[in-house]
Amino acid sequence: MKILYVFAHPEERSLNGSLREVAFAELRAQGHEILVSDLYAMGWKSQVDRQDFPQWPADKRLLVPAASKAGFASAALTADVEAEIAKLRAADGIILHFPLWWFSMPAILKGWVDRVFAYGYGYGVGEHSDARWGDRYGEGMFQDKRAMLVVTAGGWAPHYSARGINGPIDDLLFPIQHGVLFYPGAQVLPPYVLYQADRIDEARFASEAERLRARMRGFLTEAPIPYRRQNGGDYSIPGCELQPWLGGPDASGFALHSADASPVAARLSAVAG
């Protein structure tokens, strides 16, 4: 299996760098081939601008979706973007590894998504009609790929609990897991999250390293988060609202979009136990 490992941390000697090497060693031990995108080492350009679309007329107002669509269709995006798209096409699995900065992914990783998930590949796929609204949320170009997040956070685990001040970790990661990965069709596994990343000794690192190894061993077999498929009957089309008979009369929030309302962390604990 080919796994694209996208790493977004500026320091090779960091905790994240050490965790990455643990993941690499276990994935290779399982016989997987790793395709690496180390964004800081690559000097990845994070902003979308006119330079991304060399085929777009210089005197024409830049319309990013239209320019992205035209560039992708003619393989005329910049060389760095085309290379990443080639990696994605070759990969059977995707792992995004990053520290949680200001409740989201680092800007360099967001820029990788913005530039690489082109119109016609990451979005804008399939027919839009009264019967279906594109190939997305469970369908699309990533439909046969598995995906997972490896995340470090400085706060304590209770800070990210259902009643924690930072908000539930499932909610904070929802725009990435459901929006970035499930949107183009990937089967998204529960995340690996390490808390108190700035307060870790050798004994705890050894424990966390083994926990990460276990997740890498289960990459092919773990059950994905049971997100609801957009075109599977759970949503109205074209409004894309959850059907009124699903989720309960008072239910709301991100959990509605999972067929299993129990938190991801709870499901993962049950698997690990």
Language-model features, listed with the residues they occupy:
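Short aromatic-enriched loop/helix-cap "lid" or pocket-rim segments at secondary-structure transitions
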Residues: S46-Q51, Y160-A162, A203-R204
